[in-house]
Structures are given as C-alpha cells and as structure tokens.
Amino acid sequence: MSTRPYTSSVRTAAAAAKRDRVIEAAARSLREDASIASFSLDAVAKAAGVTRLTVYHQFGSRRGLLEAVFDEIARQGGLTAIADAMAMSDPHAALDRLVEIFCAFWNRDPAVGRLHEAMATDPEFAQALIGRNERRRTTVNVLIGRIAGKTASPRARRDAVDLIFALTSFAMFAMLRADRSVDEVCALVKSACHGALGPLLSDASRSGSRPHRPGASRAG
C-alpha cells in the first residue's frame, strides 16, 4: 500500500504548523521588541527557530510576512465580525456595530498601536497599513450608499465617508482613549458618526429621495 498520501498530509501539516509558528513569532516581535525597525525575516526566523529561507519560501518577502501577521491580528481582534455587521438590514445599526468592532479591535492588541506609530518611519509598514485602512473606507462607503439613497450629491457622500473614516481610525481612538473608557469612546464615536450623517440626509431629502432613517427597516 502506498504511503504517499499519508506522507503528503504529514508534510502539509508540518508546513502549516511551521507557518503558524513564524506568524506567532512575528506578531510577538511587533508587540514586544524595543524597535519595530528590527523587524526582519532574519529576526523572525531566529525567534521562530527556523531558517530565513523557510520564512522566505512561506511568505516571499517582509511585506508578505507583514500581511500574514495583519491577517492573524485581524482575525484574533474580531474583524471577521464585519461581514455580519454588513449583512444587517438597518445600515444605521450596521454603522453602530462597525464602530463597536473597531473600538474593540483598536483596544485589544498593543501591536496595532505600535504599527501605526511605525508608519512615519517605515515605508513598508506604512504601505501595508494604508491598504488595510482603505478596506475600512470601502466598508464605510458601502454603508453610506445604503443610508443616503440614490440622489444625495457626490460631495455630501464623500464628506460623510471621509468624516466617518476618520472617526473610526486608530488615531481618533487613541486620542479619545487617553482619559475615557473604551465604552465611553465607543459611545462618543457613534454620536459623532450620527452627526456626520446629518448633512448627507438633509442633502438627500432636498433632492427628493427618501434616505434610510434609523429604524426604518423595523417600522411595521
């Protein structure tokens, strides 16, 4: 009887375990090392107990490793809940839920703050994080489209998206968190997001459309 399928599955499992170990070591480096500038394939390989070539084969580059670590931080931080929020029938409730998800995420992992601080000095970190943040902008844009209806002006929609994108950022969370609890920050950001919708809803009403109002989908 051939042992090839068994051997293949063992190798696959071993490779997956090694990959997980590298990601864990990389995430630990981002959380604990004195300087994020020391983050490299060599340093992570040493911490994970593997060769640099192994890390290179698994991730291809420092950027590839960063993306894998970001994916894991996002998974552990609850960003997978965004899909459920976007499936909510009431876009206002979905926006509130989005704020809750990001407040919890920004608060959970010290690596998140350190990564944003590193954007000023490490172009590769900056490029990776800008791409991640643009996903949040895209999500906000979808919700604004649902809330505004079809006739709100492009300017009003853009202003609402930009404001809410800024309000849900790590920089905003960190500034507000200095002397507030996470729940207080979350409530304040929600209120500010509701305020950011005001001009958008007024613009849509003047245009003759019927923008989605809070709780409209639950009206009987």
PLM features per residue range, with description:
Residues 1-17, 204-220:
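N-terminal intrinsically disordered/low-complexity leader segments
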Residues 11, 18-25, 156:
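N-terminal positioning helix adjacent to the helix-turn-helix/winged-helix DNA-binding module
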Residues 21, 29-64, 68:
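Helix-turn-helix
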Residues 41, 70-78:
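Short, basic, alpha-helical segments at the C-terminal edge of helix-turn-helix-like DNA-binding modules
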Residues 64-73, 113, 132:
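Alpha-helical DNA-contacting segments of helix-turn-helix folds
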Residues 68, 81-108:
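Hydrophobic alpha-helical connector segments
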Residues 100-115, 124-150, 158-162, 187-198:
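Amphipathic alpha-helical packing segments from all-alpha helical-bundle domains
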Residues 142, 162-181, 195-203:
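Amphipathic C-terminal alpha-helical segment
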